[in-house]
Structures are given as C-alpha cells and as structure tokens.
C-alpha cells in the first residue's frame, strides 16, 4: 500500500526526471530486450535493434500507462483494466515479464534521477511498480 509519503516521492521524482515517462518506458523496454532476451518472443514482428522506432513506440506506450496509473493512484486497477485484459487474453504475456520490466524501469529511473533516486524514492517506485504488475497479472488467475 502506498503511503502519503510514497505518493509524494513518486510525484516529486516524476517532476525531477527532466524527460517524459514515455522516454523512461522506451529506455526500460530497450534494456528489457537486451538483458532478458527471452522477452523478445512477444515482439517478433518488431525491428528489435536497440533504439528502433518500434521499440521506442512500444516503450512510449509503457510510459503512458505508468503516467496514467500515477495520475490515478487510488484506482490503478480501474485505470489499467483494459491493459490487463489485453495482456492476459490477447497477447498472453508471461506474467514474469512484468517483474522483469519493473527491474529495467528501476535502472532507467536511477539513471535519469541519479542522486535523487535514493532508498526512499526507490522503495516508493518499487511499491508502485509492484501494484502495477499485480493489476496486470490478476486476470491470469
């Protein structure tokens, strides 16, 4: 459960990013495909070259979904419901990939925020990303 302090830290860190969450999503997706190559199976129709237009576009979708969830912290489930349906019923993404992407998002955030990505901020993002992953996985049950 996100505390008031977690929410404050999330909002503050987004304000300090110096880029859009869409850029963070694109960077994290690039990292995911390099570090966890098994995730490439879901993107066989994409140009998987690092920084390709396909990867950037898909990563921007990740960032937009996170941005939307951050704007609706009291209703992450409702906000991401359609995305959860898409991943569970249509794309059939292995749920472990949400955790792997979360790890890559942490690295991307830390890279952009540097010293601002301290233990408290990291914990707030970890709680948030765990909630997002839980929502995206719940339709698999």
Curated annotation (Swiss-Prot):
A GO molecular-function annotation: oxygen binding
PROSITE patterns: GLOBIN
Domain of life: Eukaryota
Function as written in the Swiss-Prot or TrEMBL entry: Involved in oxygen transport from the lung to the various peripheral tissues.
Sequence ranges assigned to domain Globin in this UniProt record: 1-141
Keyword set includes Iron: yes
Alphabetic keyword roster: Heme, Iron, Metal-binding, Oxygen transport, Transport
This protein's GO CC annotations: blood microparticle; haptoglobin-hemoglobin complex; hemoglobin complex
Quaternary data: Heterotetramer of two alpha chains and two beta chains.
PANTHER family the UniProt entry points to: HEMOGLOBIN FAMILY MEMBER, HEMOGLOBIN SUBUNIT ALPHA
Presence of keyword Secreted: no
Stated family: Belongs to the globin family.
Tissue: Red blood cells.
Single GO biological process annotation from the record: hydrogen peroxide catabolic process
SUPFAM superfamilies: Globin-like
The protein, known as: Hemoglobin subunit alpha-D
